[in-house]
Design a protein with these regions (language model features):
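N-terminal intrinsically disordered/low-complexity leader segments
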Residues: 1-8
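Residue-level marker of regulatory loop/turn positions in helix-turn-helix DNA-binding domains and
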Residues: 9, 28-29, 249
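Short, leucine-enriched amphipathic alpha-helices that occur as contiguous helical runs
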Residues: 9, 13-17
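Short, locally clustered residues in the helix-turn-helix/winged-helix DNA-binding domain
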Residues: 21, 25
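N-terminal helix-turn-helix
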Residues: 26, 31-85
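Intrinsically disordered, acidic Ser/Thr/Pro-rich low-complexity regulatory segments
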Residues: 79, 86, 93-357
Length: 357
């Protein structure tokens, strides 16, 4: 009897799962027992392979697509593979020098480096790339005010921990009085100030029932507050290759394609908001991988996000990420993101060294 490995699967089952994932990455087609028999590094009968595939399917690691006799990895299968089987590919020195040369320009502002890094990372992978500038990862909501302007209007003002200020005019409902307005200000300051900008986005929706006690139709206020928050977050990140997302959409699903178009063209912070500074339980040596429903947007069930934090000392931390299909070559992409993170960190340290002198 083959021994159990990683608590769930036998060595042979692990080998079959790994081969299915690697073949599906390369071919994009369901994998059958005959193909597996040719690909496996061990000699095993087709009947045995079918039996092992049935076990993997029953446990939810692979699934049947339509009427095909082949199998494809499930989200659970990808998760298990990334957590237990993936081995990052070592990037060759020629590719490293290529990345270094792409960063070779002189930059006058840190934002120019971060914006260029999103383009470079997108070009290297043909995926959508998201980069967060170093000062932004730890940004928190530091202050909230509503300043009366007269004629039933107030200026809603948000202050971030880096000193940046965003504001927007809000038309007050007719029946709101000064006391209710003060109660709203206290509520926001008590519940949201001190939270990271990415956390504020989700917490705001949770506050709506409380806000309704003071503002009868609170949707308008939440829209204004959310719009200001989007502007504050949007200024902290850059996106390269937005339209690459569409390359991996189901061509027969017009609704999905239309929704993805809306997502990538949205000037709010929705895509950039996927990258936050929260700890991921699935970190792989400093590289985080979120797969399918582990992301907040249901549109991205067929996508994976590979991200890494970079640290430039007293100048803060930032993040880089690629958003691509669930059948991406994880070994290669994790290795590439790891190298890119190191090279970006070097470039930023050089920039800040010159800047500080």
């Amino acid at each position: 009897m083959l021994k159990e490995v990683v608590g769930l699967l036998t060595e042979r089952q692990l080998l079959i799962l790994e081969t299915i994932i690697q073949d599906y990455t390369d071919l994009g087609q369901p994998i059958g027992s005959k193909t597996l028999q040719e690909q496996l590094p061990i000699r095993v009968s087709s009947a045995t392979i079918r039996n092992e595939m049935a076990v993997l399917e029953k446990q939810g690691f692979i699934t049947k697509e339509h009427s095909s006799s082949g199998r494809i990895p499930s989200l659970k299968g990808y998760r298990y593979y990334v957590d237990n089987l993936v081995k990052p590919v070592k990037i060759d020195s020629k590719s490293v020098r290529s990345i270094q040369s792409l960063f070779g320009n002189e930059y006058r502002r840190v934002d120019e480096i971060i914006e260029m890094s999103a383009k470079i990372l997108s070009d290297l992978t043909n995926y959508t790339a998201i980069t967060l500038r170093p000062e932004a990862s730890d940004l928190k909501l530091e202050g909230f005010r509503m300043v009366p302007l007269g004629n039933g209007q107030v200026m809603v003002i948000l202050v971030a921990s880096d000193g940046s200020v965003e504001s927007q005019i809000y038309n007050l409902p007719n029946n709101i009085d000064g006391e209710s307005l003060e109660a709203v200000i206290r509520l926001i300051n008590d519940k949201l100030v001190g939270s990271s900008l990415s956390e504020v986005t989700s917490k705001l929706q949770e506050l709506q029932p409380l806000l309704t006690k003071y503002i009868e139709k609170s949707d308008g206020f939440i829209d204004v507050f959310g719009g200001i928050l989007d502007k504050a977050i949007k200024e902290q990140f850059y996106i390269g290759g937005r339209r690459n997302l569409l390359n991996f959409a189901n061509g027969n699903n017009l609704e999905q394609i239309k929704s993805l178009y809306s997502l990538i063209d949205d000037e709010s912070a929705k895509i950039g908001g996927l990258v936050d500074n929260t700890t991921n339980p699935h970190d792989h040596h400093g590289i985080s991988v979120k797969i399918g429903d582990e992301m907040s947007d249901r549109l991205l069930l067929d996508y994976s996000l590979v991200s890494a934090t970079y640290n430039v000392g007293g100048h803060g931390r930032g993040m880089i990420a690629i958003l691509g299909p669930t059948n991406m070559p994880y070994s290669k992409m994790i290795g590439l993101v790891e190298v890119f993170q190191k090279e970006l960190t070097k470039k930023l340290i050089d920039y800040y060294r010159n800047f500080d002198e």
